[in-house]
């Protein structure tokens, strides 16, 4: 089976799979203590893919200079436990919970974890990300993440025209 066939097969299996639990989505913002390097991105992504597959968690981490936004999805207990661990992580500070909610669908269907730095991203993506980040940071309490914001985050994950490889193992953690 070719790489493309394997990728499409994994995508199809994931799409067909019905979750046997409500999807819990948590979004948070933070600031890194020091700038992330490419090696940091690679390390976070490789460790997160393995750990998130074991928990049946999917995620997207976006970093733009001193701004971090992450979306995590999965079982509520698994996502909340992961968030507690993230809050204690000394690589970042000013951790703010933006949104924590149940949903009927998983938005980050095939990605155990995608890490995206915005170096080299088109100007409009940088500006839109910074505007959304500032808006969410300034909001009192929790906010509802809009479909437009989710679409922006997915566009960032796909920027450069290269979709992230599916990394979620179907049935993992179940």
Residue ranges and their predicted role:
Residues 2-174:
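Charge-rich, low-complexity N-terminal segments
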